[in-house]
Amino acid sequence: MKFSELWLREWVNPAISSETLSDQITMIGLEVDGVEAVAGQFHGVVVGEVVQCAQHPNADKLRVTKVNVGGERLLDIVCGAPNCRLGLKVAVATVGAVLPGDFKIKAAKLRGEPSEGMLCSFSELGISEDHDGIIELPIDAPLGVDLREYLKLDDKVIEISITPNRADCLSIIGVARDVAVANKMPLSEPQIEAVKPTTDAIFPIRVEATEACPRYLGRVIKNINVKAATPQWMREKLRRGGIRSIDPIVDVTNYVLLELGQPLHAFDLERLNGSITVRMAKQDEKLVLLDGTEANLSTDTLVISDEKQAVAMAGIFGGEHSGVNEETQNILLECAFFAPLAIAGRARRYGLHTDASHRYERGVDPQLQHKAIERTTQLLIDICGGEAGPIIDVTDESQLPQSATITLRREKLDRLIGHYIPDEQVGDILTHLGCKVTIQENCWQAVAPSWRFDVEIEEDLVEEVARIYGYNNIPDVPIRADLIMKKHRETDLSLQRVKTVLVDRGYQEAITYSFVDPKIQALLHPQQQALMLPNPISADMSAMRLSLLTGLLTTVVYNQNRQQNRVRLFETGLRFVPDENADQGIRQELMLGGVITGNRFEEHWSLEKQSVDFFDMKGDLEAVLELTGKLSKISFRADVNPALHPGQSAGIYLENEYIGYIGVVHPELERKLDLNGRTVVFEVLWNKLASRVVPDAKEISRFPSNRRDIAIVVPENVAVEDVLAECKKVGVNHIVGINLFDVYCGKGVAEGHKSLAISFILQDTARTLEEEEIAATINKCVAVLKQRFQASLRD
């Protein structure tokens, strides 16, 4: 937005320089993008009047004039401007004047005729780029007055960038309010009084779309002179605001737009049929706009219509059919509040962007319309004459925005700003901003003014106090933090440590969605009911996962479809299990899961291709379990899992408590999920592994160890794990290592049995074991195994 500094100072005039004022405007949140002088540097240019104008005898395009500048004699000046004529008030650069670019005016002869100065155009004075002709000043401009003083050219145009929430500052009054508060000064508003009707003329108005248009005001003004000249002061303010002067009616509505921030529109009353209706556009309805283009209206576009057709696009652009022209005598002046959501995006849809739509999209003061229509009416009558009728007011109060009561707590204010601002000063700032403030204990109750519709929550009030108090007035305080070492128990096992082990073993971490395809999940967990989402992203993401397995297997398929056949992934994340006894009926548990498929090793010329199997995954998992120090207490037991191969899977138990599973994916599931080749998975409850057993340091024996091997035959259904556990119990004092190194079934072993080859490492920390002691320990183990498992030594 652009505006004149002098115009702003008519409303509030702090005793500060232009530079300081610009900095202040920026610091209160209205960023100044640029400041430019209204005119170039020149002097010696005065107001004059052309009293004689004749054709140059020696040039077709030049005129010889005599110009009165209020001195003792008339000046002879040769001029080539096409609009030079008798009686015109002009800007005269007299002899000795210096124009922009250090151009000095001297007496000279042009084609034989003397010229004692120059009649200037706007471009020659650096005021604008208009060089079509010389400046035409009002007929009442006083002769001989310095042009800089008359046009108030010692002024600057300030351009500010307005954030979308500060639509109230798309006007002089909005900027002036903030400047006044920042300088603790009163606002000098112009007196706006109600215009008494001098005619009973009215025009019927009906609002159908009350939600989109809660308030619509109309006023008939008759016998208006549309050919009257817009005052120079108004044209200059418009020009400095970036708006071109068109005619007095448009100029006045644009002036009030810049002054108060309220868009208005004038219809030619004689070109309206019957009545005005504010409604949504009809299907396939068209409207020819003021610029001559035709818009094909969509049904969500708000329009102003008469009894025959749409006559304007509400809040965006007027229609050609009802537009004011040189023949207009009677007008209907419109001033309305359109809801931002009813206007937002519509202008861009039709390739338009107008000052009105820019403001309506962001919001205007819903209580401003009466004030704006009275201001516009008075200016129109002062400039164009006419007779004003009464205001027709169609308002639905229930649809108008209402200001909320907001509580600002002292604790919240101090915490967010980081600086104490006295209570009295906080109250003054809010009051001067237009809020209705009630002071309570340690807080303020504030109702924002109607023009500050962006102030809705407590943080908004904190921002208002901070920016008016001045960010520069908030002292810089170095950031302080107490560096307290986090307590770390030696028994805690870091999840990051586990991830590092898996990465070192060739795995990559995956992060999959907690939302999964319920159909795939049902294949993996047919007996469990999942939590379904009421508003899912899509049908294949409509269930909360019961395990990490669904996401991991889906990721494997995704990679295999992209020629990545060797896949090793792990993931940590929550699973969501419906449980009536859990908080809010959902049990959330952190899980650790993994999956491998493809070759055991990366492809290499010296290695044969070997597919991964159950024991590859078991080895990787045992590397993780080793970190807990509980590996000796963890057992793998044959178990039934519908997602896993019945002969190549196991449940994982910690001291008889189930904590997870491991196994090869069931062949039937491999087919249904389009998995390519054997796929092995595991999943364990992380909270069961998150603590570790701190190892006890023991003295390394200086005495020799002894190895003894035995081969025993046991029934085929006996678990090796149980055999080894019994041996450990027997030889707890001397056996320091037990290892299964061979399993054999076949010739020499009875059917339904298997041969287990077990090695024992025996050692004592205090002495060398005698052969008799070693033999006694081994014999005792064999005896226990015979009794417990019907084992026998193999021949």
Swiss-Prot record:
Residues annotated as domain B5: 401-476
EC number: 6.1.1.20
Residues covered by the FDX-ACB domain: 701-794
GO terms for MF: ATP binding; magnesium ion binding; phenylalanine-tRNA ligase activity; tRNA binding
GO cellular component, one term: phenylalanine-tRNA ligase complex
Required co-factors: Mg(2+)
GO biological process: phenylalanyl-tRNA aminoacylation
Cofactor note: Binds 2 magnesium ions per tetramer.
Main location (coarse class): cytoplasm
PROSITE patterns: B5 (PS51483), FDX_ACB (PS51447), TRBD (PS50886)
Subcellular location: Cytoplasm
InterPro entries named among the record's database cross-references: aa-tRNA-synth_II/BPL/LPL, B3/B4_tRNA-bd, DNA-bd_dom_put_sf, Fdx_antiC-bd, Fdx_antiC-bd_sf, NA-bd_OB-fold, Phe-tRNA-ligase_IIc_bsu, Phe-tRNA-ligase_IIc_bsu_bact
Top-level taxon in the UniProt lineage: Bacteria
Ligase found in the keyword field: yes
Catalytically driven reaction(s): tRNA(Phe) + L-phenylalanine + ATP = L-phenylalanyl-tRNA(Phe) + AMP + diphosphate + H(+)
Gene3D superfamilies: 3.30.56.10, Bira Bifunctional Protein, Domain 2, Ferrodoxin-fold anticodon-binding domain, Nucleic acid-binding proteins, Phenylalanyl-trna Synthetase, Chain B, domain 3
Chain positions recorded as Mg(2+) binding sites: 454, 460, 463-464
Subunit field text: Tetramer of two alpha and two beta subunits.
Family matches, as HAMAP family: Phe_tRNA_synth_beta1
Similarity annotation: Belongs to the phenylalanyl-tRNA synthetase beta subunit family. Type 1 subfamily.
PANTHER family documented for this protein: PHENYLALANINE--TRNA LIGASE BETA SUBUNIT, PHENYLALANYL-TRNA SYNTHETASE BETA CHAIN AND LEUCINE-RICH REPEAT-CONTAINING PROTEIN 47
Name of the protein: Phenylalanine--tRNA ligase beta subunit
Gene behind the chain: pheT
